[in-house]
A protein has these predicted regions:
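Short, surface-exposed patches at the edges or C-terminal ends of soluble domains, predominantly
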Residues: 2-614
Length: 614
């Protein structure tokens, strides 16, 4: 009886506890209905509005209005509209009254006409039946944004996924703000040196008639029209560079700069609040040259950059610890790995994260929150902070691994091949660096009557040197694409081309998103708008596995081809074994832990019952 009485009391107490907990849950939900808080644990804060977006909105002179035209009725569409609404609410909370939005579902002829007149495009939406039957639900409607600021209007005609949406919304707001307030960001690209051009169509393999293809400048001007990229011909340094440019870009030259031209560049930087970005190295290669035979030349940049504390060395970097790899099919139906140590694949590695050996500085605007970057055909840089005043920061932002050799011969064979032989000595090399502050003139102490330059900039100027000759292009398409005939033969597009190089050019395109975002972030940095670079990180997909727990093969000087192949195979085997362990751990590990916890609780409760005194 005592036992039954005890059980009745326990059951009554349990019921009371359940009622109390349920009441607390109901009250908490009622009180928290209007409260909003979520935690974003992703590295790039993928699901949190960037602080820079909030500052942009709060800094507007008048409120921006967004009309969001949406379509609901399918589970995936409903989920997307909820995510979109949550994001717009975050903008509203961060905007300090400068952001307003309206959700509109065009379910009448009048609203549909309104959406079409605004510039939106009606889109079909489909969703497979989740019951497993061979059926799908199809609907049609509008899913886009209309932005209004002052007298200006802009449209994002179609939005299909929440990932990266903040990037496009924030940059579109910036676009209409700049247009309404007549804010211009003019970027000069130095020309007249047979240089690599941002208008070169070598991002992807050329196919069929018409050649063509996307260009770096075309992508920037179409997606981010608030940047105006203009050519600047120094013409022997006869005239000063237009002071209205926010910055200059130097791309890989084929001809040398003379001293007067370099002094004009220095004169521009000494104006203060200016930027110079150099995408060049000593490794010089010709476009459409399938031999990939490079010559080493600094083209006069060695007379300018050392004065800012960044010396470019006349060498070609070969990084055997972070070399570019690509899998290619074999005749037997398998796959083999082709390596190119002349193309450094720099990955952010927590094991090398001190100021003196960090591989990729992901706090720098150009590589902000990026897990990897590709540096084709780099030269090493030597930093000398004594060349600049103590308050000017000269720092490396990208390095190779310690397993890096350099070649200093006049010509270097960069052609793809099965085996590469490391040469001593091997050490870590700097391949990208910045100098930021009130810069001292690179020609301080050696004035010229032809170009009179201030000894020091009155305000902060910025220099970035990315010592990679083909950073802004696809190196395999650059070498493998056939030349455009031009003139009366233009209709035939590119002719010829190297099939093997073009085969490698296609998989290389997966790295171009990071390259384009790095370039766009660098433009923001040049214009002094680096506050918005955090939004770019949300466009980058989830990074590939880096296998940081597995040591990469260490290629030593003197390794013969057989030894190098053996190390490659051991590395691939270790990666495959790691994949297998992770697979089975995820398959059986969690269920086993759950079962073990259940057994533990069962034994615990059994022990308590056995100890119960009647």
């Amino acid at each position: 009886m005592a036992s039954q009485e005890h059980r009745r009391k326990a059951a009554a107490q349990t019921s009371l506890y359940i009622l109390v907990i349920a009441a607390i849950a109901v009250v908490a939900n009622v009180l928290g209905a209007k409260a909003y808080k979520r935690w974003d644990t992703t590295q790039a804060e993928r699901y949190t509005l960037s602080a820079g977006s909030g500052r942009l909105i709060r800094g507007l002179n008048s409120p921006v209005q967004i009309d969001a035209y949406v379509k609901t009725g399918l589970p995936q569409l409903d989920a997307f509209v909820k995510d979109l609404t949550d994001l717009l609410k975050e903008y509203e909370r961060a905007g300090g009254g400068k952001f307003k939005f309206t959700i509109i579902e065009p379910n009448t002829d009048e609203l549909r006409a309104q959406a079409k007149e605004a510039g939106l495009t009606e889109t079909p939406f489909g969703e497979a039946n989740q019951t497993g039957e061979d059926q799908a639900s199809i609907t049609q409607g509008y899913m886009g944004l209309v932005l209004k600021y002052g007298s200006e209007k802009a449209v994002i005609p179609q939005i299909m996924q929440a990932e990266g949406l903040e990037f496009w919304i924030t940059n579109k707001i910036r676009e209409i703000r700049d247009k309404a307030e007549n804010i211009k960001h003019r970027i000069g690209v130095v020309t007249g040196k047979d240089e690599f051009k941002l208008t070169d169509a070598n991002l992807v393999p050329k196919q069929g008639k018409g050649g063509g293809g996307p260009t770096m400048q075309g992508i920037i001007e179409q997606a981010f029209p608030f940047y105006k990229v203009e050519e600047v011909d120094l013409k022997g340094g006869e005239n000063a560079i237009d002071k209205d440019f926010v910055g200059l870009i130097i791309t890989q030259p084929q001809k040398d700069y003379d001293e007067k031209e370099l002094r004009r560049i220095d004169e521009f930087l000494m104006l203060g609040n200016k930027a110079l970005v150099v995408y060049a190295s000593a490794v010089t290669m010709k476009a459409n040259d399938a031999t990939m035979n490079a010559t080493l030349s600094l083209h006069g940049l060695d007379k300018l950059l050392p004065g800012y504390g960044i010396k470019m060395n006349k060498d070609a970097v070969f990084d055997y610890g972070a070399q570019f790899r690509i899998g290619v099919p074999t005749q037997g139906g398998g796959f083999t790995t082709v390596r190119h140590p002349g193309i450094a694949h720099v990955v952010s590695d927590s094991r090398l994260d001190s100021e003196n050996d960090r591989l990729l500085d992901t706090s720098f605007a150009g590589f902000f929150r990026m897990e990897e970057a590709i540096f084709p055909f780099a030269s090493s840089l030597t930093l000398d902070k004594s060349k600049q005043p103590a308050d000017v920061k000269v720092a490396a932002v990208a390095r190779t691994t310690p397993a890096t050799s350099v070649v200093t011969s006049d010509t270097v064979d960069m052609k793809l091949r099965a085996e590469w032989e490391p040469k001593p000595p091997q050490e870590q090399r700097v391949i990208a660096a910045t100098a930021i502050g009130k810069l001292k003139s690179a020609f301080a102490g050696s004035p010229s009557d032809a170009v009179k330059v201030a000894e020091r900039a009155p305000t902060e100027s910025r220099i970035l040197v990315i010592s990679s000759s083909e950073f802004l292009t696809n190196p395999f398409a650059y070498a493998g694409n056939g030349p455009d005939l031009g003139g009366q033969f233009q209709m035939f597009g590119a002719v010829g081309g190297d099939p093997q190089l073009l085969m490698f050019a296609q998989p290389y395109t997966k790295y171009l998103t990071s390259t384009i975002l790095s370039f766009k972030n660098t433009l923001d940095w040049m214009a002094g708008d680096a506050d918005l670079v955090a939004t770019s990180a949300k466009l980058i997909g989830d990074p590939a596995l880096t296998y940081s727990d597995i040591s990469k093969p260490k290629f030593k000087a003197g390794d013969d081809p057989a030894e190098a192949k053996k190390k490659d195979e051991e590395y691939r085997g270790a990666r495959k074994w790691m994949q297998t362990k992770v697979q089975w751990t995820l398959t059986f590990g969690v269920p086993v832990l759950f079962a073990a916890f259940g057994l533990f609780r069962w034994q615990q409760r059994k022990s308590q019952r056995d100890q119960l005194k009647i």
